[in-house]
């Protein structure tokens, strides 16, 4: 870690900040069985990827894209957006210590508007919120996390990524940023080799632990 330079915490959203991945698994699992029965565990295959990438890759037909998007937006309107245990307090602790916080989500602005309605405090919790519209490539490409670090001209060794999905973990590691796997969506065993450190949730994590890992 380089002293006297910004420290940045880069958070994926679903499954890291918000406890929503199990709900998305239900939706995308049903979509996969309906439209792509030849792809087992479709919900796991697409986790962490932007909606645009998912549509272009698996639903090239424009009419089918509209149908899937309509079903998704209706589903998101009725989702519950609870916080992952401990994450709210952890983010507040980071702010108290001057750590820059960035949401790096594959979700689009339409989905995030549902989050803001459910949590009016969400926007002011973070220094920046990056959505799929900000990225030129979907996870597992590292572009999104490199962009998050660049916003504050932070050295990569001063940054930490928090991710739950395989694609997100690959993006963090490909960016050459210390990557913490959050075992909410996938088991500890399955993400251990893809992470630099693994936590179950944020009740067991703190600013001091983050600094210890970055030093």
What are these regions (language model features)?
Residues 16-17, 78-79, 101, 133, ...:
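A generic structural signal for short
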Residues 2-97:
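N-terminal helical cap/lid subdomain that shapes the substrate entry/recognition surface
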Residues 19-20, 47, 103-104, 163, ...:
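Small/polar loops that bind or transfer phosphate-bearing groups
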Residues 45, 66, 81-84, 106, ...:
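Non-catalytic, surface-exposed connector residues within folded enzymatic/regulatory domains
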């Amino acid at each position: 870690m380089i002293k006297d330079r910004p420290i940045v915490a880069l958070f994926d959203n679903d499954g890291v900040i918000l406890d929503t991945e199990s709900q998305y698994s239900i939706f995308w699992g049903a979509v996969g069985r309906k439209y792509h029965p030849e792809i087992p565990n479709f919900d796991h295959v697409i986790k962490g990827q932007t909606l645009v990438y998912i549509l272009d890759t698996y639903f090239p037909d424009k009419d089918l894209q509209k149908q899937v998007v309509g079903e998704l937006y209706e589903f998101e309107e009725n989702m519950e957006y609870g916080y992952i245990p401990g994450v709210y307090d952890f983010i507040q602790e980071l702010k108290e210590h001057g750590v820059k916080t960035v949401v790096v989500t594959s979700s689009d602005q339409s989905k995030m508007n549902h989050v803001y309605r459910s949590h009016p405090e969400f926007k002011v919790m973070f220094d920046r919120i990056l959505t799929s519209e900000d990225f030129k490539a979907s996870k597992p490409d590292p572009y999104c996390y490199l962009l998050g670090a660049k916003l504050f001209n932070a050295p990569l060794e001063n940054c930490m990524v928090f991710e739950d999905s395989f694609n997100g973990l690959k993006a963090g590691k490909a960016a050459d940023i210390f990557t913490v796997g959050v075992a909410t969506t996938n088991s500890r065993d399955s993400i251990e080799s893809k992470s630099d450190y693994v936590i179950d949730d944020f009740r067991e994590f703190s600013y001091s632990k983050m600094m210890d890992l970055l030093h």
